[in-house]
């Protein structure tokens, strides 16, 4: 996900004048793949205490949703599908699965995941409301910085989870 954030920020935004909209697709796809892997990890981690059928359902749904969102984003060249995939993947699946795990296990490492989710929401809000500092550090840049902080906390959570 860190590579996707940097790739999206550098190629997709900084060199937009040279690559056009198609320069954004590698960052979009890497980001969606990273979110899908986060989902798979959360589902697998949750299988310790979830019924098998629920884990299986979300595993199959994970394949369907990544394929659907990737095709929609490529066909329409609309970033909204990348955003929707991230909201679904990181909040509905990862956050909710890990919140349930936290309620059952009280694993302190999961607190960093909740902090990461907060930074992810901040990134989304910066982008949605176009909150930038100036024309040279606009909402795209601010949201990528918030995403980078979020990624740091996701990695920290992964290293501290039991």
PLM features: residue spans?
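Polytopic alpha-helical membrane-helix bundles and their juxtamembrane interface segments
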Residues: 1, 11-29, 35-162
């Amino acid at each position: 996900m860190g590579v996707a954030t940097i790739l999206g920020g550098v190629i997709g935004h900084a060199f937009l004048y040279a690559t056009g909209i198609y320069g954004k697709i590698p960052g979009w796809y890497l980001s969606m793949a990273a979110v899908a892997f986060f989902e798979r990890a959360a589902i697998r981690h949750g299988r310790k205490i979830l019924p098998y059928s629920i884990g299986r359902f979300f595993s199959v749904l994970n394949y369907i949703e990544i394929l659907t969102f990737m095709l929609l984003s490529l066909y329409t060249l609309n970033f909204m599908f990348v955003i929707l995939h991230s909201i679904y993947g990181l909040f509905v699946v990862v956050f909710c699965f890990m919140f349930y795990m936290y309620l059952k296990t009280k694993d302190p490492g999961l607190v960093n995941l909740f902090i990461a989710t907060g930074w992810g929401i901040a990134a989304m809000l910066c982008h949605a409301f176009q909150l930038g500092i100036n024309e040279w550090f606009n909402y795209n840049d601010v949201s990528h910085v918030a995403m980078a902080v979020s990624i740091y906390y996701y990695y920290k959570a992964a290293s501290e989870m039991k």
